[in-house]
Design a protein with these regions (language model features):
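Helix-turn-helix DNA-binding elements, focusing on the entry/boundary residues of the two helices
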Residues: 23, 34, 45, 60-63
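Short, conserved catalytic or interaction motifs in soluble domains
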Residues: 53
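Short alpha-helical DNA-recognition segment
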Residues: 31-50
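Phosphate-coordinating loops and pocket residues in cytosolic domains that bind phosphorylated ligands
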Residues: 39, 79-80
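DNA major-groove recognition helix of helix-turn-helix/homeodomain DNA-binding modules
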Residues: 61-76
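Key DNA-contact positions within bacterial/archaeal DNA-binding proteins
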Residues: 46, 56, 75
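N-terminal flexible/basic segments that precede or flank functional cores
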Residues: 1-30, 35
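Alpha-helical residues within the helix-turn-helix
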Residues: 28, 39, 68
Length: 80
């Protein structure tokens, strides 16, 4: 499962969970609703909701759209 660091096991967090948490945090930082973010990046509101709830397996193109709308680089959405 996780790697041992200093004798302690570290739980692995999925990329989907990291992406979801980062999208939610960045969206809230901007004071945007899911609908506002969806409008800014040209995606449907339900798509954004599914990403945030970790329901969708998202394509790299859509990660880029979200990042551009949020004013960050795509890799930042995948940084724990």
């Amino acid at each position: 499962m996780g790697s041992a660091i200093g004798g302690q096991s570290r739980k692995k967090v999925s990329a989907r969970a990291v992406l979801a948490a980062n999208v939610v945090a960045r969206r809230r930082d901007k004071g945007w609703s899911q609908e506002a973010l969806a409008f800014e990046c040209g995606l449907h509101r339900t798509f954004v909701a599914h990403v945030e709830r970790q329901v969708r397996n998202i394509a790299i193109d859509n990660i880029e759209k979200l990042a551009v709308a949020l004013g960050i680089e795509p890799y930042e959405l995948l940084k724990p």
